[in-house]
A protein has these predicted regions:
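Catalytic nucleophile-loop/oxyanion-hole region of alpha/beta-hydrolase
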Residues: 42-51, 63-97, 228-229
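Short, surface-exposed "cap/lid" segments of acyl-processing enzymes
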Residues: 24-54
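A fold-wide structural signal in alpha/beta-hydrolase
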Residues: 29, 56-66
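Structural cue for short, hydrophobic secondary-structure segments
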Residues: 32-35, 64, 180
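Primarily recognizes the serine-hydrolase "nucleophile elbow" in alpha/beta-hydrolase
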Residues: 84-149
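C-terminal catalytic histidine-bearing segment of alpha/beta-hydrolase fold enzymes
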Residues: 204-244
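The feature captures the conserved acid-bearing segment of alpha/beta-hydrolase catalytic domains
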Residues: 125-127, 132, 138-146, 157-195
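N-terminal cap/lid segment of alpha/beta-hydrolase-fold proteins
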Residues: 1-25
Length: 244
């Protein structure tokens, strides 16, 4: 499998590098943002690498993106960085479908890119230019660690402000399609938060394709625990959704 590692896509943070896992087919390019609560995680995580290789084996070129983390970042730096990563990939693969996904904190980033239209809009990219969005157990309300680091608040609080993807949902919401992957034993409130997001979007635009899958297990188990067939449920369910 051909790969390109540690491609610098931005000069904002020393962590702003990405890896590309090239597929032999051209089914599309998947841009992935890892989880870790904005304090941890990177593209070298063994699970993340295996996920990248799995998607490439299914015909999707896969992009693992690193971004700045606390305590060496401030909101919205990692969102600006993420938008630059998308810009780089759009320019690198101008004729392929682009999909954006993420796990936990990475799903939060993906949601922000989708619903805060200014982030990608600065680079001439609209949410509709992305062929699909996959959010694995993201937090659509204000992220708990952003409440902690940015506002000094109790991370258990529920807030909808400029730190929340939900804050940007309005009558102009428009996207190709989205998949929400959630878990039966997810983080407290995570299922309910995502139901609120889905219903808020549908309230403005009932015709949008917003699908959801509820998997067995704890928070993001589908991208950290393989099934008996050796594949991650997150990968399998995403592939099924993309190709149906």
């Amino acid at each position: 499998m051909k790969t390109e590692k540690d491609i610098r896509y931005s000069d904002i943070s020393p962590l702003d590098k990405l890896d590309i896992y090239f597929a032999n087919e051209e089914k599309g390019v998947i841009i992935y943002f890892h989880g870790g609560g904005f304090e941890a995680g990177d593209k070298y995580d063994p699970h993340v690498v295996e996920i990248a290789e799995s998607f490439a084996n299914f015909g999707y070129t896969f992009v693992n993106v690193d971004y700045s983390l606390y305590p060496n970042t401030k909101f919205p730096s990692f969102l600006i960085e993420a938008a630059l990563a998308v810009k780089y990939i759009k320019e690198r693969f101008p004729h392929q479908k682009i999909y954006i996904t993420g796990t936990s904190a990475g799903a939060y980033i993906s949601m922000m890119l989708c619903f805060n239209r200014e982030l990608l809009g600065k680079h001439g990219i609209k949410p509709l230019d992305i062929s699909g969005w996959i959010f694995e157990s993201g937090q659509p309300t204000s992220h708990f660690n952003l409440l902690k680091f940015e506002k000094g608040l109790d991370p258990l609080l529920q807030r909808i402000d400029e730190l929340a993807p939900l804050y940007y949902v309005d009558k102009n919401v428009l996207l190709s399609k989205a998949l929400f992957i959630l878990y039966t034993d997810d983080m407290p409130n995570r299922y309910e938060q995502n139901q609120l997001m889905i219903k808020a979007v549908k309230n403005f635009n009932p015709s949008l394709q917003l699908d959801q899958i509820l998997l067995e297990g704890t928070h993001c188990a589908g991208s950290s625990i393989k099934d008996n067939d050796g594949l991650y449920p997150y990968v399998k369910k995403t592939i099924e959704w993309l190709e149906r």
